[in-house]
């Protein structure tokens, strides 16, 4: 019997449901219907291989059910030892690949039900878990991966880890089901003072940004903390609320939204303000209409002033006025840079975040070899790339030798700057929501676009490109200068006009078109940008389209420009 998500949560006995019975059922590779919802809170999604779905149906077989498992790794920082362990898990239990997400987590794909528990236990043995990596809770907390600000990054990471731990569910269900923790009778009701018995109305996302870098796309988060640094000292954070990417095609009641900056807090106020924001969404969010349940709609429905006042009431203090800040880009810069502490950091481009050994690349083997050097740490970036961080100068040569041996810098040397900085969600064949290809299509589209860029002398001009298989926007497409959002197999909405700083939403330019139509639409625009753009002042493609009057701000009810007085 199908229940609403709200009913499933409230009747789940703190996220237990019948998961243990579902896992023990050897007749099917699937979970019971309600448990498919609950397992998300444990960090996993039930999926199936859509490439062979029709064939299995013809053979009267159930779908090829499999599970995606996502880690909770705040800020995407792990040790070389942990990297090696995750590599081993991917090889033993998953599809021989690791995938870096846009929220600095890892995803394992292709895990079958009978090996799900063993995989969870192996992940936890690395001192990494998957609790609350999915579901209507706070998800993995993003942290700027800026390798230049060594001390500031350490502080941001520590603050993000504090917030992540503070917002974890209290339930012991995760530990009972996956780690065989015994339930102690009379041990209390596992009260959830932050989440309550129904958790949040919808997923909740938090990001920590460190200007001038906005790699986390902080304005796409439900709650953002923008570090205010003065003379190398972290004074505190500007707070932003109400960002979100998800929307539905053709539904005027849904839209992407950039967050509002509402004030400034000190570090010792972080947990209080995070709790106040999350509980405000818990109590004010729309639980009746799930597509309208994100915090951005809560703000739009009740009014920003009302929500800010409620946050201040719950926190017990009013936010201070926001401090000046400025972002200059939201992408990654590749190659070696020296941090302020004298250690070196190597950023490697990982196309769509996929780490695997293929006929053309040996990323999994190469990064395994680097991890075996046991130097520095591994940082996932919010752009699905990887930083080999904190490498002593004396170890650079050994790292460089392995990078060369395994061609790990092939992505850094892509033919166009656009290809080097592009992002895509997983989409087909595993995502059940995908309407079109994304990760598998990105290399082909980049290659098709490359001649146009080279023809107009734009091969080395950075243009933010993102591809999403559906309008839910996991690759944050609505902030890109150029984005493809899947509408149907081989057909996309072409979105144009975002910026390189993650501060402006793009606009629908052409709807439901094929690759030849996309290229035909882009050809005259790229030609104009090449000849009329203010390249001397580094004018971006999206900025040019607005200045030239090609693109206007999108028609969403809440779209606005950032408060100019905050941009120092």
From Swiss-Prot:
SUPFAM superfamilies: Nitrite and sulphite reductase 4Fe-4S domain-like, Nitrite/Sulfite reductase N-terminal domain-like. It catalyses: hydrogen sulfide + 3 NADP(+) + 3 H2O = sulfite + 3 NADPH + 4 H(+). [4Fe-4S] cluster binds at residues 425, 431, 470, 474. One of its GO terms (molecular function) is heme binding. Binds 1 siroheme per subunit. The keyword Magnesium does not apply. The keyword ATP-binding does not apply. Alpha(8)-beta(8). The alpha component is a flavoprotein, the beta component is a hemoprotein. PANTHER family: SULFITE REDUCTASE [NADPH] SUBUNIT BETA (PTHR11493:SF47), SULFITE REDUCTASE [NADPH] SUBUNIT BETA-RELATED (PTHR11493). This is Sulfite reductase [NADPH] hemoprotein beta-component. The gene is cysI.
